[in-house]
């Protein structure tokens, strides 16, 4: 578990663990939770590294595995853990730091839909440990708000990591087939706040050794039509926004990148 030398006794950090219904979409943006202190950028970057180490090292998973850097970085190997987190968002006051993120735990069978509800108490305990470690970094109270997502396609950060994680055992056609055959991802049954999902893979998966290195494959489900603010307001329609993320990792054939676009109605 990542540790930072303690400088003095700190106020007990807070931790909040939420479960989220699978009928909503969640982007990386949280209104009102932007960092208000530019001098905290360096600390925030250090905090991101610690959070990644907790997630990819298995500290937030039921099994402890070899620690590897994961999640936010776009140039590192994907760990064997099935715990994925979004990019955190930071809010600072003089006495407290609030960190908000989403997380998803994949099922043992690597299904796109996770139905496991076990060990939530263990996950909650590990997030509490994370709050304690981050409190030592910031030297103030840290409040971690961790919201569980039950489907990886609700957040682009999580979906890009999830697909890259499953790259060693799947082809791009497998990804496409999963989207087509999984009822929860059919274009007529997308969550109400999601109008479309696009997935693009650049490079070669280990299951596709005969294709060129520069191959780019993409698949789109749903619609990515975007209305201007004025037009949408006049017609009473939804204004769409794009939640975008990419994740780059390596296999024995070289580097490959998974890019994800999620079109959301707001």
Curated annotation (Swiss-Prot):
Q: Which residues form the signal peptide?
A: none
Query: Keywords in UniProt for this one?
Result: Mitochondrion, Ribonucleoprotein, Ribosomal protein
- Give any single GO term for biological process: translation
Question: What Pfam families does the record tag this protein with?
Answer: VAR1
Work out whether the entry's keyword set contains Nucleotide-binding. no
Q: Name one GO molecular function term.
A: structural constituent of ribosome
One of the record's GO cellular component terms: mitochondrion
DNA repair in keyword set = no
InterPro entries associated with the record: Ribosomal_S3_C_sf (IPR036419), Ribosomal_uS3m_fun (IPR007980)
**Location in or out of the cell:** Mitochondrion
Q: Which family does it belong to?
A: Belongs to the universal ribosomal protein uS3 family.
Q: What is this protein called?
A: Small ribosomal subunit protein uS3m
What is the species listed in this Swiss-Prot or TrEMBL entry? Mycosarcoma maydis (Corn smut fungus)
* Gene this chain is encoded by: MRPS3
């Amino acid at each position: 578990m990542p540790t930072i030398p303690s400088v003095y006794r700190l106020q007990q950090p807070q931790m909040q663990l939420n479960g989220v219904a699978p009928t909503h979409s969640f982007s990386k943006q949280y209104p009102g939770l932007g960092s208000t202190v530019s001098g905290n950028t360096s600390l925030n970057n250090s905090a991101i590294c610690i959070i990644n180490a907790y997630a990819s090292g298995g500290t937030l998973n039921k099994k402890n595995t070899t620690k590897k850097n994961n999640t936010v970085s776009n140039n590192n190997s994907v760990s064997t853990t099935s715990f994925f987190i979004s990019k955190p968002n930071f809010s600072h006051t003089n006495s407290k730091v609030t960190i908000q993120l989403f997380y998803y735990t994949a099922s043992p069978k690597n299904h796109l839909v996770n139905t496991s509800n076990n060990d939530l108490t263990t996950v909650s305990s590990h997030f509490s440990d994370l709050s304690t470690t981050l409190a030592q970094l910031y030297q103030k109270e840290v409040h971690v708000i961790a919201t569980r997502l039950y489907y990886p396609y609700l957040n682009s950060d999580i979906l890009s990591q999830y697909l890259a994680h499953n790259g060693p055992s799947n082809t791009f056609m497998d990804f496409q087939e999963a989207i087509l055959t999984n009822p929860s991802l059919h274009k007529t049954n997308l969550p109400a706040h999601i109008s479309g999902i696009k997935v693009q893979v650049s490079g070669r998966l280990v299951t596709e050794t005969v294709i060129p290195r520069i191959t780019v494959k993409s698949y789109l489900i749903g619609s990515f039509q975007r209305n201007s603010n004025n037009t949408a307001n006049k017609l009473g329609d939804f204004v769409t926004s794009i939640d975008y993320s990419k994740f780059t990792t390596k296999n024995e054939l070289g580097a490959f990148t998974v890019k994800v676009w999620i079109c959301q109605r707001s």
